[in-house]
Amino acid sequence: AAAYKHVPMMEDNPEESVRNNVDGTRVIADLAVKYGTRKFVMVSTDKAVNPTNVMGCSKRICEIYVQSLDQAIKDGKVSGRTQFVTTRFGNVLGSNGSVIPLFKEQIKRGGPVTVTHKDIIRFFMLIPEACKLVLEAGTMGNGGEIFVFDMGKPVRIVDLAERMIRLSGVKGIEIRFTGLRDGEKLYEEVL
């Protein structure tokens, strides 16, 4: 999987979101059909559900494209055998740009730890869970489905920051609320 996934960067560079996320998915999906790939697993995001930002919109367009291509193959409108399935993730802990390394670095520097809003919540999963979802979708999918991993209850980001500060043993670290960024939601949806 390759995509731009950072909301602020895509808000500032919408044309790159289209070029990389949408055009990149379209080219790879079309090549999968052309060369007879049996299964195509697209990695999407919870931000594609009722999208409020460029990145979420770009991933929703990708979801629609691969589902449409899958249906066109089933209907005989496109010649091919590729089955297209989609996985939809929340935030993957430990991935590039994850909040955990950011908070660790901010704590190490003595703070402040920056959180956009006191009520912001996010779903999280671990890298092995994300890998498992992709593999399961590739194995179980028959084409056209969107697979969503049960990520449990969403986590309040301020609670995560407070826990990390407490576990660090460092006293007096301030949590600073910076305000929601352009396109950012207070909460994400998975369905």
Predicted regions: what they are:
Residues 6-64, 68, 74:
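Conserved Rossmann-fold NAD(P)-dependent oxidoreductase catalytic core, especially the SDR/UDP-sugar
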Residues 48, 92-94:
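Conserved sequence/active-site signature of Rossmann-fold short-chain dehydrogenase/reductase
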